[in-house]
Amino acid sequence: MDKTQPLTTAPQLGQLLRAARKRRKLTQAAVASRVGLSQNRLSYLELHPDEISIRQLLAWCATIGLELRLGDRDAAATQDAAW
């Protein structure tokens, strides 16, 4: 089963990061220490994900068990239409 989720807005990214953290029962402080941020900064970034650096995003995803993938939007639409 494919659990990928397309993201088109920064707020969606914040919601996804927060939900994945909570599913793994990790506190903001635990994730922040592994990513190299303060708990306050991580909390801020969950609400303002447009300010997350790529380096922070990759470390954050690794910490909470997510994988970042990029794909061609047109190819995904073609696959969806085939179903």
Predicted regions and their residues:
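Short, charged recognition helix plus adjacent turn
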Residues: 69-83
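Short alpha-helical DNA-recognition segment
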Residues: 25-43
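A detector for short, charged/polar N-terminal pre-domain segments
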Residues: 1-12
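DNA major-groove recognition helix of helix-turn-helix/homeodomain DNA-binding modules
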Residues: 55-71
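Short basic helix-loop element that most often maps to the first helix and adjoining turn
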Residues: 15-30, 59
